[in-house]
Amino acid sequence: NITGRNSNFNGTGGNVNITDTGSAVFLLDNVNFTSGTNFNDNFGLTSNSGYTYINIKGAVGNLSVLNYGNTKTISNDDTIFISSENSNVTLTSAASITSTNAEVTGVYSKDGNVVNNGALSLTGNKSSALYGENTNITNSNTGNITVGTNGSGMYIKNNTAATFNGNNSGAITLGAGSVGMRGEGEVALVNTATGNISSTGLGALGMSQSGGTRNLENAGTITLTGDKSIGMHSENITTSGHQVKNTGTITLGDSADSANPSVGIYSANGTNSAIINDTGGKIIGGARTVGIYGKNVGLSGSGSGTAS
């Protein structure tokens, strides 16, 4: 257990062996750590089961800080690389976290902030790169996320009245059945102009939200060429004035069956949501796809759509 803002850790060489399920390598409390400065974890690790690599906690109004930049490979199912509470966690551009194992989480955050400037490649089934509860998450323009089947790039749950933000300015690549950005509750999701969400897998979701009142916005690029995929998806919005807005480009591949097609923008909110394909917005669909599905649809400025 390492406690205090003046703490440091210098681990160079050797090996850590974990034998108990659910163990943590690091327990950090009220710290301010930066890789290569006052935190060095250059050692080997072996484990018989899932574990948490770094568990970091701060306090309300006094968040712990972790700026992590190292190369690590996770070789066990059910593992969390960083678990944080009341903390600001940043993966620097030097960070590279990889795993082919199942149900691996890159960063889990509760009541904090997460920024990814590095690379997360978690290709095992049901893995999540960045997962937060009551947390702001950003994948910056240098951030590169890859997840396998039935996983998520960025997932935010909010059970408070406050608003939390999920922003993607980097690259998110998805396997079949995975979602790029997902928000539940008062979560504002934005795929910015430099954001790129892509998948060749079956049944992928680019952006998805459920509940709350915050708009869902795409200004970047969403390319889903696998069948039965949805570019932007919104549901359970019960307050009027909500918008699902596209000023970017959504591209879909061919669908095998017109009765179960890929959809560019899908809203299940009735008239509570306006679907806006605004100036510069493009929806390009392959054979037997649907560009926009919803009850309150608007095309503004030079917004366009093609689907067949």
Predicted regions and their residues:
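Anion-recognition interface
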Residues: S84
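Short glycine/proline-enriched coil/turn segments at helix->beta-strand junctions
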Residues: K110-G112, E133-T135, G185-V187, G211-G212, ...
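Beta-strand-rich solenoid/repeat architectures in extracellular/passenger domains
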Residues: N1-G22, N32-Y51, V60-D78, N88-E103, ...
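Short aromatic-glycine motifs in intrinsically disordered, low-complexity regions
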Residues: N158-T160, E184-E186, S210-G211, N236-T238, ...
